[in-house]
């Protein structure tokens, strides 16, 4: 695998799609963007060179923020002249533990760093200062296995925080594992509440623009073979639903160890089974008007890509896919691919963020 380091792309309609690209031993200028396959009329370009970008967020003033899983840093990105390239890349915080998740509330930046939720107040006014973020909550598990987090504030004002399973497949005595928690950041004390259970490792979610339901990706377990189980796209219509893990994978695959322990537990099947081992991360419903009308309110999915499929079968994922609502139901197809060449990946999409002009940013860690 070629190691670049981190980038953010921008995708738009000619139409520009932007890509956040990592910093590494190879210059972003030499990225083989010509190998990426996009629909006719779309263009993709590098928006910023960033170290290991994961979740993206945007402030009220339009500053882009990028968390990281491995670099331990939070970056701020500023496109000062509006040319779709961030000339200024700032380190806003560093020496953090897997600060992958970011969320904006008002003018405050919230950061998920393993067991902690951190906060930088008045972020737009403090961009040129290296911050020591305030720890506002310290109580999530400190297990590093699936410990990185994607976070966001919901329509209800609560902070949604997934807590991944501390394993490939297990049934923990601690019910906070394999769940999505909510946190009222205005409360004292802050006490997490379980929103959804049976969620192995969700690293991306959003709310449907019409129903307000939470849609989230979930990464399927490993070591059941190259072609199963599927990864999942789920819809949570209310608090308290259970989405199957570790008992059921996808719609109907009983786990060989835990399937018989399901009992009378009622589980919610995925709204869409994704490919096996594609590792779906960030998602975004398209709400802009830059793309053609048939893209509106359709769901873009960043597929980070497989890591342990057999060489003879080949890797899967490493693309931006799109889930479309059609007269036949929800259908799933490729929007951008080409990061995987000859079974070797030169990029791994991680998150998607729509900008005010209707273009998309795609982080590649």
Regions of interest found by a model, annotated:
Residues 82-88, 125-127:
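Acidic, glycine-anchored loop motifs typical of Ca2+
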Residues 115-154, 162-165, 196:
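Asp-box/WD-like beta-propeller blade repeats and closely related beta-sheet repeat scaffolds
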Residues 46-51, 90-95, 136-143, 194-198, ...:
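Surface loop/turn motifs at the tips and blade-to-blade linkers of beta-strand repeat domains
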Residues 29-38, 148, 165-169, 175-189, ...:
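Beta-propeller domain segments
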